[in-house]
Amino acid sequence: MSADRVPTYSVGELNTAIGSLLERGFAPRFLLEATVSRPQVKKGHLWLTLTDGTASISGVVWASRLAQLSYRPTDGDGVTVVGKLNFWAARASITVQALDIRPSLSTVLRQFEQVRQRLEDEGVINPGRQRSLPSQPATLALLTSVPSSALADMLRTGRERWPMTRLLVIPIPVQGAVADQIIKVLNRLAERCEALAVDGLVLARGGGSREDLAVFDDEALCRCLAQFPRPVVTGIGHEDDLTIADLVADHRAATPTAAMVACLPDRDSAKRNLQDRRQRMKDVVGWRIERDRQRLNDRRAFLRQQSPLRRLQQLQDDLNRKRDLLRALSPSRWLQRGLALLSNDAGETLSGVTSIKVGDRVVIQMNDGELDTDVKVVRPSSHQSMS
């Protein structure tokens, strides 16, 4: 190659040319997966080294973006950086300008385990401290993003299950570095629980990646939840998602809708239960009335048997029977049938001819009077011998 065809640059020109090539040949934005090393803030800007173990590159978050980050990386964190290249022509240096930094799943899980272990050691995470939920809460405080599909589902479920409970909706941010904001809301609500008649708290968020749910692993937030004066129910993400907030709550539900189901009784089931109880009460009352009626009848019958009037009636009946018997045996009844009663002068009743002699005077008593007669002949019966 001839010398006149070889380009000649000054250092500044060369660096500028390199910068132009980078601008034309590289994406204006990209995702970079890396591990953070030696992060430090200088003059309000966050400087850090991004490495994958085999190579490294400098990175920076300008102060204007740093305040907007939802996550502040620490040394050793795995991250995904949304960035673009910055080339400084004066020194021919390349830096990744981070527009956003998100924790990698491994970082989220590592921080989760660290917080969980600390809170377990202190007894903050302890199933034994969980409080039971009110059966029919007067007021439920719903902390979630507004508007959101999660809130819409919760309100619909509340109306369907138990419309008598007042639902107090309190908007909160649910993603990013918002733990401090949620804590402030919780503290204000804790001070007004009595005034607002709040019986329970539902902390809810719809689905998202595990990284999106990282705010609910915040240690300070979870300590605040554990100290809340009313039972706390969480419905964060989906069934497979688990956060530290779920572990410190009094009840963990798989979804926001499931959280409402856990807090509120079912109106239809309650109605059926009430009807069943009413029927059982009617049956019991009816049985007791019938039992007491039978007892009353038995006692009434017993009293009848033991009453003076009943006794007098029994004596009267007995007297009547004896009177009838005496009447049946009375001589007058025999006289009425045509028979006669014979007696001697001494008034002694004569039962046979053996005590009568010829010439004796005999009185014959008949039904309508008496006859005095003298005995002329005595004729004993043939089967009796004469003395």
Swiss-Prot record:
Matches recorded under InterPro entries: Exonuc_VII_L (IPR003753), Exonuc_VII_lsu_C (IPR020579), OB-fold_nuc-bd_dom (IPR025824)
Places the protein is found: Cytoplasm
A GO MF term: exodeoxyribonuclease VII activity
Catalytic activity: Exonucleolytic cleavage in either 5'- to 3'- or 3'- to 5'-direction to yield nucleoside 5'-phosphates
EC annotation from Swiss-Prot or TrEMBL: 3.1.11.6
Keywords associated with the record: Cytoplasm, Exonuclease, Hydrolase, Nuclease
GO biological process entries: DNA catabolic process
Gene Ontology, cellular component aspect: cytoplasm; exodeoxyribonuclease VII complex
A Pfam entry, by short name: Exonuc_VII_L
Subunit architecture: Heterooligomer composed of large and small subunits.
Known role: Bidirectionally degrades single-stranded DNA into large acid-insoluble oligonucleotides, which are then degraded further into small acid-soluble oligonucleotides.
UniProt similarity note: Belongs to the XseA family.
NCBIfam families to which the protein is assigned, alphabetical: xseA
HAMAP family hit by this protein: Exonuc_7_L (MF_00378)
Record's protein name: Exodeoxyribonuclease 7 large subunit
The organism of origin for this protein: Synechococcus sp. (strain CC9902)
